[in-house]
Swiss-Prot record:
It is found in: Cytoplasm. mRNA-binding protein involved in proper cytoplasmic distribution of mitochondria. Its main location: cytoplasm. This is Clustered mitochondria protein homolog. Residues 380-622 form the Clu domain.
Length: 1400
């Protein structure tokens, strides 16, 4: 199938705008000469030449079209109709014939490998017990690694035979392992223990099996009667109880079904020589449920009972002898219980949703777990002592050469879509395997199970190699980082380095290689795991480094090949090529920071490593003598001393800053052009002949002042014309009106609430007028400025008159561009690096660069922080816990070290009350991060045998109200007779191993407050956990969750009494495990992502069907690269479900959303804020499908999770409670419904202000329930409130106001009728003739309509004519945007809210 997508160039693998800039016309494969619009899916236009690398999201053109993601996809159809051939498998059916079963049909696709059919058969209920077989077509054995399309004679209807093959030792082991996996398939212990990429999911507990089976539901009437709607007490609004146990409800499927008591390797292994020659491979020892002990031989022909006992070796077959090719068949013969239970178990296994059992790409750990019985398990025991990672033993040569695998996958061809998919899939797979291996190795290193390569040195200086991975500890070895902050710098360097590796991998330049890098924090230590450059261990570092510096800049070397390769990355990464002086005082050219080292491996590849300074330094945290920061920074108390001197700006900040500068550049050029035009007109009027001369004499005023101070954009900003300077130096004080400009025409924006992809547009420029297109539109010359800048960049500029060139030159100087003819901002990462010296002739450049860095630091505090706070105020950013808050900071390029500054900023806001939820999450994040810093050093002094005692003691000091916590030193389990004087294992610095026990709660809290002050510059007003809870409104269970997730602690799931003053909350039995916290690179599926963005864009333009097709295509591509489980697939499924719902396909919406919930639980965690969102969406679709009780259960689950994660006081809780209240109203539980709706009303009033439309809607919902209860007075009171808000906010004529007014009339009539009836009763007593009052339960349709409204989905039937008008209007606007002619049009803009399914 050929799917036409108008905005994805087939030939651009990783659409880097820089490519467009270089290739000029060639990017436009249809050969159109118009260079204006070769837009790729990310919406970069060819203007990128004027812009700068990846910030190519041309803000000036797109600030306005934020709502349609990919710029003007519509006109692009004519401009360059790129056709993308998407591999669409036309699947076909084959017949499979397995021994002992009927032939069955299997749907396959030509792209699949034979191996994938093997996997399917090993998973099917009737063939799952076979592992050692081949597939044969007409007697020919098929090659496992062949693609089906390459097999001759294989077609629709072919018969494939499953033929049993003889076993080898390897095959026998695989068989036993597979049988064990089948026996354990419903057992959640692997998920609790965080092994084999298993993780938890509880959706099925609430949805009672699959949600698709609507057909089996009872009729509406009976459905209502059978619902038990009352939630548990702790879920009701106002409940202060936060139990922990319901976090993991017991799944009835998990009652263990025992098939065998013991399955283990026999101690008679391996077979002696004479038995090998009889075909014996290994011996198994088994105890059946009936308590029969048997010994089994695995031979080349299969499995049989032998006559051995525990003490007597007798390998002859037992009598009667059964030889079975499969262990399951043999066990079914000898144990009836096994046969019965195994069959039931497999039935249950296949009934589970596949997403509950597919492995996740990276391990997810659970911070709570129940007490599980530790069962005998031979495979687990064997795995613990061999390095089985993935499939080592299947690969020749045993251990994997990680470096070779990682680099070879990068070298795969990427010319067309199928090749790119193959390449990205390979890269992703190797990365997830490498991350798993590195994690396991890092734990082995810290647990003391790996021999060091320099065992003679003290522990903290040791380095390790295990499984072809190099491990080093995060300590300052050999005073390498002494000048940069010692151990603190050594701890920060690996994460900086990892960010550098991420950045270079994303740019993906051919011929430039980075190391596989994983950073693991485990038991208080930071371990860096890296793949090994071939040959590096044989040479001294001095000999191998041919680019960069090994001593922070004292000696520096360079290499032309490296300069050439790094030059390609410099544009997207905004790195300026620069010269530094070496020890001989001669200049050396670099295109990276000096620490970045280039090494050519023995494999001839060019590697770069030590990328810790890929991004420029953050001057707010780097005091430099004699340097003044900008006033914005100084006002907030910067620069501040930081623990180390490696504080860098984030890549997101650099991109936002450059984008911000680009807008500025465009405005300045436009203003100058206008002034020139005005001057020209004047002089033309005076005398035509001198026009040219006069024009050049009357150089515009603004320009002269710009010229005077080209170095400092901040100073030049103030010299622009007044209207413009207002627009550029806006910071905190930007008024709310400016923001209204942004909310123009969101046609059906269906990104749900937390669409990660939509969020990427948010880090646009500064707060205030810079955001909206309208601000630019006041400057009439903008379109000319854009054309001018483009034409300059496109040619050598010879055809352009000098005046225009001067305009661009001035604008370039003013914004700090490194080029004089085009906009190009880059940073020199070596500025302010101690020990780095620059040649004298670059002094001017250095001065400019210093200023640019100061401006970037000022931009962070004066623009990005206020814009984050503004987004929180208008609820476009809704963090719920520490992780989502950190993500919100990072999206805008704000490092977490600014957390104190952000909190301070909120504290001083007039609208502080409306930010209370964010402030509370921020404080809890600050406290738990400080506690984590302390915990790290605390754990380093703890012996392995005292670990659980130490961890529980620390948690008591942190969270328990028990005043005199006493540590239990682990003297209880064993006391050694002689004091062993062995060298203590792995305690850097040795010292007293019981020092940890002397910590007290008050001392810990003192340390936390001083850490908060020292690290975050924030003064915490509390001396104990109870004061913190009291003052900041925190919850202890939330603090426990945050600290456990951050440090990897796993605790027993039970109810903890934190507030008891008589006994501590935690005992050492409550600490079940410590897991590693792992950071790694996340390789991306670039093509799928482009499809996804184009789909979003289409949807937002109102083309739902086209959008839906693109997103389905994206889903296929995501699955192709990531496999079935990934966080991006989750976002894709959610959007698809929403589209299905809007387009009226409710069952399909339900099915996709169910997958999204399961995936979110498995990949992000069962109580991650995203999972809570997914539960809410699923409940809505369940309700629409008539599954009322399920909808309620899901909403109650979401509410419980949210209470644990952030408590009740959060704007999102209002939405949740409105949903619950509406569903309860629908099932006629009026009193319960009111509790939730009134709570929603209170929260909405607090966070949106009493006059907001959300509050008006809340009043209306409450009024409806009161009406159903016949309490008309209360109903009237609420509806009146709502009416007043509507009247004041949208005016009398608006539909909402009219509806409210009608409803008021109706309520008044009802109230009067009721009063009349009551009077009648009072007057005539019981024999009054009463007209029966009409009590109506709300119809399901009306409840659903309200549910849609509060969830941001509004359906309004449109006639064909309306649709055409709407389309015409959308196109007209786009045309106007292109030509830059939209004037301030706010008065006239379409009220689209009422025309289409809108989702806000």
């Amino acid at each position: 199938m050929v799917s036409k997508t108008d905005d994805i160039p087939a030939s651009v693998p990783n659409c880097s705008p820089a490519d467009f800039a270089r290739d000029g016309e060639t990017a436009n494969s249809k050969g159109t000469t118009s260079k204006k619009e070769a837009s790729c899916a990310c919406g970069h236009g060819v203007e990128t030449a004027v812009m700068n690398g990846d910030a190519g999201h041309d803000q000036a053109e797109e600030a306005d079209s934020k709502q349609d993601g990919s710029g003007d996809a519509d006109q692009a159809e004519d401009a360059n109709e790129q056709e993308v051939i998407v591999i669409q498998d036309t699947g076909f059916t084959v017949k499979i014939q397995a021994p002992g079963t009927e032939p069955f049909d299997l749907q396959v696709s030509p792209q699949e490998m034979v191996q994938e059919i093997h996997q399917v058969l090993m998973d099917r209920e009737d063939t799952c017990h076979r592992t050692c077989f081949s597939l044969q077509l007409d007697g020919n054995v098929l090659d496992n690694f062949a693609e089906l399309k390459s097999i001759e004679g294989l077609q629709e209807g072919s018969l494939l035979k499953v033929v049993e093959e003889p076993y080898t030792v390897r095959e026998a082991r695989i068989h036993v392992r597979h049988i064990r996996d089948l026996l354990k398939s419903l057992d959640p212990s692997d998920a609790y223990n965080g092994v084999d990429c298993n993780s938890l999911s509880f959706l099925s507990v609430f949805s009672e099996g699959d949600l698709g089976d609507t057909g089996k539901r009872k009729k509406k009437g009976s459905e209502l009667e059978q619902i038990d709607c009352t939630p548990p007490e702790h879920i009701l609004p106002g409940s202060k109880e936060r139990p922990l146990v319901p976090l993991q409800p017991q799944n009835k499927d998990w009652k263990p079904m025992q098939c065998l008591k013991v399955l283990t390797m026999s101690s008679w292994n391996p077979p002696p020589g004479n038995r090998k020659m009889h075909g014996d491979l290994m011996y198994l020892y088994i105890v059946t449920v009936e308590d029969r002990h048997v010994s089994i031989t695995a031979s080349t022909r299969g499995f049989y009972l032998n006559q051995s006992t525990t003490y007597n070796f007798s390998p002859k077959p037992a009598n009667p002898s059964f030889l079975s090719h499969s262990l399951v068949e043999l066990l079914s013969q000898i144990s009836a219980a096994f046969k019965k239970n195994f069959t039931t178990l497999q039935k249950k296994r296949v009934q589970r949703h596949p997403f509950e059992r597919i492995a996740t790409p990276f391990q997810v750990y659970s911070w709570t777990a129940p007490q599980i019985d530790h069962a005998m398990d031979c495979v687990r025991a064997e795995d613990a002592y061999t390095s089985r990672l993935g499939y080592e033993e299947h690969i020749p040569g045993q251990t994997r050469d990680w470096n070779e695998e990682l680099q070879t996958t990068r070298e795969l061809s990427r010319k067309n879509l199928p090749e790119r998919l193959l390449r990205e899939r390979a890269i992703f797979k190797v990365h997830s395997d490498f991350a798993a291996a590195a994690t396991r190795g890092a734990m082995a290193v810290i647990d003391g199970n790996v021999m060091a390569i320099n065992p003679g040195e003290e522990t903290r200086m040791q380095m390790f190699i295990w499984n072809n991975i190099f491990f080093s500890l995060g300590f300052d070895v050999r005073d390498h980082y002494r000048e940069l902050g010692g151990d603190s710098a050594a701890h920060a360097a690996p994460t900086n380095d990892l960010n550098g590796v991420r950045a270079y991998s994303a740019v993906d330049v051919e011929g430039l290689y980075t190391l596989g890098t994983v950073v693991v924090d485990y038991r208080g230590y930071r371990v860096t795991a890296q793949s090994i450059i071939p040959g590096i261990l044989e040479r001294e570092q001095e000999q191998s480094v041919i680019y960069g510096s090994i001593d922070f800049g004292k000696t520096v070397v360079s290499h032309p090949k490296y300069l050439e390769l790094l030059e390609k990355t410099s544009r997207p990464l905004k790195v300026q090529r620069h010269a530094v002086l070496n020890e001989k005082d001669s200049a050396v050219e670099l295109c990276s920071s000096v620490e970045c080292k280039g090494i050519i491996g023995n494999d001839g590849r060019h590697y770069i490593l030590d990328l810790l300074r890929t991004f420029p330094p953050d001057l707010n945290f780097l005091p430099v003598e004699g340097e003044e920061l900008t006033p914005e920074s100084q006002k907030l108390g910067f620069p501040r001393q930081h623990r180390h001197r490696l504080a860098c700006l984030r890549q997101e900040l650099i991109e936002a800053f450059v984008e911000h500068r680009y807008l500025l550049f465009m405005k300045m050029a436009a203003l100058q052009l206008m002034q020139q035009k005005a001057n020209k007109d004047k002089t033309a009027a005076l005398q035509d002949s001198n026009a040219a001369g006069a024009g050049s004499e009357n150089k515009p005023l603004a320009l002269e002042s710009c010229d005077g101070t080209p170095d400092s954009p901040t100073s030049s900003e103030s010299t622009l014309t007044p209207e413009d300077s207002e627009a550029t130096t806006v910071s905190e004080n930007s008024s709310a009106e400016n923001q209204e400009a942004m909310t123009e025409v969101p046609v059906a924006s269906i990104n749900g609430t937390h669409e990660p992809l939509a969020a990427e547009r948010q880090n646009g420029g500064c707060d205030g007028p810079l955001e909206g297109k309208e601000a630019d539109e006041n400057i009439p010359g903008l379109a000319q400025a854009k054309e001018l800048a483009e034409s300059l960049a496109a040619e050598d500029g010879s055809g352009i008159d000098p005046k225009s060139r001067e305009v661009v030159l001035n604008a370039c100087k003013a914004v700090g561009s490194i080029s004089n003819t085009s906009f190009d901002i880059r940073f020199n990462p070596d500025i302010f690096s101690p020990g780095v010296r620059f040649p004298d002739d670059s002094n001017d450049d250095i001065k400019k660069q210093k200023q640019l860095l100061k401006d970037a630091a000022a931009f962070l505090v004066s623009c990005q922080i206020p814009s984050l706070v503004k987004d929180c105020l208008d609820h476009s950013s809704l963090p719920m816990d520490g992780a989502t808050l950190t993500e919100a900071l990072h999206q805008r390029g704000i490092n977490v070290r600014y957390l104190g500054t952000v909190l301070e900023f909120m504290d001083n806001m007039p609208a502080k009350a409306q930010l209370e939820h964010i402030y509370r999450i921020g404080i809890s994040e600050l406290i738990t991060r400080c506690a984590k810093h302390i915990f790290k050093t605390y754990l380093q002094g703890v012996d392995l045998s005292a670990l659980s005692a130490a961890v529980s003691y620390f948690l008591n000091c942190l969270l328990s109200s028990f005043p005199d916590a006493v540590a239990h030193l682990p003297a209880d389990e064993l006391v050694s007779r002689k004091k062993s004087r062995k060298r203590r294992n792995r305690v850097p610095g040795g010292g007293d191993n019981t020092a940890w026990a002397s910590l007290t709660p008050s001392e810990l809290w003192k340390n936390i407050t001083s850490e908060a002050h020292g690290y975050y510059n924030f003064s915490l007003q509390c001396e104990s956990v109870d004061q913190a809870v009291e003052k900041y409104g925190l919850q202890k269970i939330t603090l426990l969750r945050e600290i456990s997730i951050k440090t990897g602690i796993q605790i027993l799931i039970k109810e903890y009494n934190f507030d008891s003053r008589h006994k501590p909350a935690f005992t050492e039995e409550d600490i079940l495990n410590i897991f590693p916290v792992v950071k790694h690179v996340n390789p991306k599926a670039s093509d799928a992502f482009h499809f996804f963005q184009s789909g979003q864009a289409k949807v937002q333009q109102g083309f739902l069907k086209e959008g839906c097709e693109l997103i389905n295509e994206a889903l296929n591509l995501f699955n192709n690269v990531y496999g079935a489980m990934h966080v991006e697939i989750c976002a894709c499924l959610r959007l698809l479900a929403r589209l299905n719902y809007i387009m009226g396909d409710h069952p399909e919406a339900l099915s996709n959303q169910q997958k999204a919930v399961l995936m979110s639980e498995r990949v992000l965690g069962i109580e991650h804020p995203n999972t809570i969102q997914e539960y809410m969406h699923l409940a809505l679709y369940c309700f629409a499908n008539g599954q009322l009780s399920t909808a309620l259960k899901l909403l109650y689950r979401a509410r419980y999770l949210m209470l644990v994660v952030c408590g009740e006081d959060h704007p999102e809780m209002a939405l949740l409670d409105s949903n619950i209240g509406l569903v309860l109203h629908g099932v006629m539980e009026y009193d319960l419904s009111l509790r939730f709706l009134e709570n929603a009303l209170a929260i909405n009033t607090k966070y949106h202000g009493p006059r907001s439309l959300k509050v008006a809607l809340s009043h209306h919902l409450v009024a409806r329930v009161y009406e159903s209860k016949a309490e008309f007075r209360s109903a009237l009171q609420h509806e009146k409130e709502g009416y007043t808000i509507y009247k004041n906010q949208v005016g009398e004529a608006h539909e909402k106001t009219k509806e409210s007014s009608e409803y008021l009339k109706y309520l008044t009539q009802q109230a009067v009728a009721l009063q009349r009836t009551m009077n009648e009763i009072y007057k005539n007593g019981s024999n009054a003739s009463i007209m029966p009052l009409k009590f109506t339960a709300p119809s399901m349709a009306s409840v659903l309509e309200q549910l849609n409204i509060i969830n941001g989905i509004i359906f309004i039937p449109l006639s064909q004519k309306d649709l055409e008008n709407l389309k015409a209007e959308v196109q007209r606007r786009q045309l106007m945007q292109d030509s830059g002619k939209i004037q301030e049009q706010q008065g006239s803009h379409l009220e689209l809210d009422d025309k289409l399914p809108v989702d806000d």
